[in-house]
Amino acid sequence: MPYYLQDSDGELLKDKGKQKDLLEGSSSGLDKITYDPHSWLSVVNGKKYFNAIQDKLIEKYPENARLYKKNKLKCVDKLTDLDAQYNEKFKALDRREFLVVHYAYAYMARDFNLIQYPLQGLTSLESPSLKTIRKAVDFARDRKIDTVFYEYGKPPKEAQALAEEIGGKVAPLASMEFVTADQKKKKQGYLDLMEMNIQNLYESLEKGGGQ
């Protein structure tokens, strides 16, 4: 899949014919995952990435420096606000643990001093074993967890089955590994999904999602 640089209105910054493909084809199989790769799911890392992206874009397209700086400041300010606002909110809660299908939220958990309990590994390709599900049920009941998080944009079948077992409910968390048709329709970007993730986690813990 080729990628092209666009401005905030969706217009190409350079003529398409002059653009170079950043990556052709799928990126799957290029790396062997031995660590949590979901580092973008962090308000702290996100700010670093926006700064790094701005610097590289200015280096390549200095004529657009003002636009890049403006957009970077907007994004960094939003993440800073989310960080400060929700760190205060999470500090006031006794609950810290949440149950999730996909093991993708270690960085977000770190940012807000939370603990994730995943059913799957670092990829969402494999299904959890019956033994894993039984342990998750016992874990949830022991800690009075009533929310099971599924990956936003994918069927919540496994999360719903577990939620029914513990008499709970399901809620979405976005790993942002892919873009869904619904996200395109709603024009949901990185900041929107980060805010949704943090808000959903907070609401579940505030109302009884762990201890």
List the predicted regions and their residue ranges.
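Extracytoplasmic metal-acquisition and chelation regions
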Residues: M1-Q211
